[in-house]
A protein has these predicted regions:
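C-terminal non-catalytic regions of proteins with extracellular/luminal or membrane-system context
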Residues: 1-2, 6, 14, 42-166
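Conserved, charged catalytic cores of large soluble enzymes
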Residues: 10, 14-33, 37
């Protein structure tokens, strides 16, 4: 009933108020030009590089961009800004998707970079099935026609986290 919803909302927001979740935080006043400054970007880059784990390398990495080749970047997370943030994040001042970054790196190398979504992260009823069904065959054909395929799959912050109902 409406009364039950009201009581539940009061309990929820009273608890959040008592926890201080509505209090002013000095962290809210840090401007983007500080958050996204060169020093912080370099530190974030260093943390990312040092935290990468390579489980197996059969001579594939590091990639050589000297030869002119074709590269496929495939997957719903390859061109997703939502996939770049976790569920405990602030709003980044800027972000570069995997396909954007790879395209920028390869601009002057002669590599041809092509992107294919491959699939959706979840079944979206607003997208007609006819449009969903072509994605995987398109991605497979692209991968077969390229010298290298980078596949970006997994979850993003819209699908994983806390306090979410599916």
């Amino acid at each position: 009933t409406e009364e039950e919803i009201r009581r539940s909302a009061e309990r929820l927001f009273t608890t959040r108020y008592l926890l201080g979740l509505f209090d002013h935080s000095s962290l809210d006043e840090i401007p983007y030009n500080v958050v996204g400054c060169k020093e912080h970007r370099e530190l974030a880059y260093q943390a990312a590089v040092e935290s990468c784990v390579l489980l197996k390398n059969d001579g594939t990495l590091p990639l050589s961009l000297k030869d002119n080749k074709r590269m496929a970047v495939i997957g719903p997370n390859a061109d997703s800004h939502a996939a770049l943030v976790g569920n405990y994040n602030g709003t980044p001042p800027r972000s570069i998707t995997v396909v954007e970054g790879i395209t920028r790196i390869c601009e002057d190398t002669g590599w041809d970079v092509t992107y294919a979504e491959g699939c959706l992260l979840y079944d979206d009823p607003s997208v007609r099935k006819v449009f969903q069904n072509y994605r995987i065959p398109e991605a497979v054909a692209l991968a077969e026609s390229c010298d290298l395929a980078i596949v970006c799959v997994g979850l993003d912050s819209t699908l994983e986290g806390e306090q979410g109902d599916v």
